[in-house]
From Swiss-Prot:
Subcellular location field: Cytoplasm, Nucleoid
Organism: Prochlorococcus marinus (strain MIT 9515)
Region feature Disordered, mapped onto this chain: 89-116
GO molecular-function term, one example from the UniProt record: DNA binding
InterPro entries, per database record: YbaB-like_sf, YbaB/EbfC
Assembly and binders: Homodimer.
Name of the featured protein: Nucleoid-associated protein P9515_00191
One Pfam family named in its UniProt record: YbaB_DNA_bd
Gene3D superfamilies: Nucleoid-associated protein YbaB-like domain
TM segment ranges: none
DNA-binding is among the record's keywords: yes
Amino acid sequence: MAGFGLPNFGQLTEAFKKAKEIQQNAQKLQDELESMEIEGKSDDEMIKVWISGNQLPLRVEVKDTIAESNKEEIEKNILEAIKKAHETSTTTMKERMNDLTGGLNLNLPGLDNNDS
């Protein structure tokens, strides 16, 4: 029996094991997110963008026929594609983090667990 409201040694050891496991898996997840290529495209598919699971821009593809569009339409399509890629990437990252932590509410910066 632990005194002074402290957990017993077994519970403490188990908590440290779990923390170490999460830390190791977090590094694997970081590597996985870094190597992901997530696509976002405009509704008319004139513009496609790819970003990593860490939301870093990777590349852009523009159809030849985009030259027939006006400036405002091109800008709208670029923004649309970026937003879709970012949303998918962010959702993927949150899901993977949730899987990693087993649904623990860790309140990690940038990952509002209440968004899901």
